[in-house]
Amino acid sequence: MRSLQAPVVCPSVRPRQLGVSALLVNCSVSKTRSLRKQFWGNQTKNDKSQAATVNLRLHLRRYKSIKCLFSSHSDGTGSTAENFNENDEDYVKSSVLEAVEVKSGPDGFMVKMKDGRQLRCVHNNPQGGNLPNYAPHSAIVLKMEDGTGLLLPIIVLEMPSVLLMAAMTNVQIARPTMYQVVKDMVDKMGYEVRLVRVTTRVHEAYFAELYLSKVGDKSDCVSFDLRPSDAINIAVRCKVPIQVNKYLAYSDGMRVIDSGKLSKQTPASDGLLFTELDRPNGQPCFDTKEFDLVRNMMQAVDEERYDEAAEWRDKLGKFQAKRKLRKYT
């Protein structure tokens, strides 16, 4: 374990205040409905308590010396970043599927793929029971690469899912995303991303860890707890392995029992991947406009409307060119 000691003045953020918002996304597929109620029921109280804590800390006039400890504890084994084993037998390698959404209904648990296929799945764990019916949700789906072919669907917010698909399909976005900024910061500090692990599930929320090491010295290693949606986005951009805790893979994983092909005539309103993006204070947002164009292009490709997809691609290129010109004028 490594420690740093220095005078620091910063607002205090309590771990318990972070827990409520973390539950809404990066969660398992079995409790989406109850999580939504828990989140909205506690949001106002949480925001007020967090604001009060920040206001209280900002009135401090005295510098205090604090100690920051870097350690890894998400997997519950007490291992630290310095002694982690990249080939730990408790973890299995995985790959990211080009899945766009998941849903549960009368036909069972379905994963909609980017190429139009519908994968019908069942719980790998016999004790998993039947999932409640719920509408389509954006999701990141990991496939175990240990020969079992198990899938681990992680329900996420729409934006991380869109950005992940953009990274996997090499869709260029004019402005750097948060994940690109993190990648550049790691490079500037002389570190490199080693791997990402989905480590555990607490109630219905999954947790992940991002491992970094000093360039040229793999023994100098630190780790950070992240949401799986963020960690996986970074891993894809940095082209590093994504590992999943074996217990999670086998207890929460899904087995594919049927793989079909969507009809080309499937209406666009049937289980749309994307909904209208949030806009700050209702005003036009260039980022939202750009993602709308990306959304429409990808939707057309999914439904094999390639002529229309080419038109959206051209519109996207013109929009990005105008935006770049506006930036320098």
Swiss-Prot record:
Sequence ranges assigned to domain UVR in this UniProt record: 287-322
Principal location class: nucleus
Record's GO cellular component terms: nucleus
Enzyme Commission code(s) on record: 3.1.-.-
InterPro entries attached to this UniProt entry: BFN_sf (IPR036104), Bi_nuclease_dom (IPR003729), UVR_dom (IPR001943)
Top-level taxon of the source organism: Eukaryota
GO terms, molecular function: nuclease activity
Location relative to the cell: Nucleus
Alphabetical keyword list: Hydrolase, Nuclease, Nucleus
Entry annotated with the keyword Nucleus: yes
The keyword Zinc is assigned to this record: no
Function: Bifunctional nuclease with both RNase and DNase activities. Involved in basal defense response. Participates in abscisic acid-derived callose deposition following infection by a necrotrophic pathogen.
PANTHER family to which the protein is assigned, alphabetical: BIFUNCTIONAL NUCLEASE 2, VON HIPPEL-LINDAU PROTEIN
Family as reported in the entry's similarity comment: Belongs to the bifunctional nuclease family.
Protein name as annotated: Bifunctional nuclease 2
Organism: Arabidopsis thaliana
